[in-house]
Amino acid sequence: MKKFLLLLHEDVEKMSSLSPKEMESLLNAHMAWAGKLAESGHLISGDGLNENGVSISGKDCIIKDGPYLESKEMIGGYYLLQAADQETVVELAKECPCHLWGGTTEIRPIMEMEDYE
């Protein structure tokens, strides 16, 4: 099985405008979907990400608050999945709850040792 990182890109304004009930609904949808992924053997891990972070760049290690302060999008969470191929993950990702609130999923294959040869 190959590993894939599923990044959840979310609209900052849209997410901040959700009511507490909508946020609870979103969380419950993610919990249910994660359960389905676990049952099928595809889920390795996953979690939400706090928008308050830092970025460190360059050889001088310049530190800035928040990785994308000027962006309208943020990476709000991730799922680490395993599957036979990327096509399987694409089909799984189509059911990700973040799409219900206008989010985008990005699939990135995790490199294996043989990929470096």
Question: What would you call each of these model-derived segments?
Answer:
Residues 1-117:
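Conserved, structured core segments of small domains
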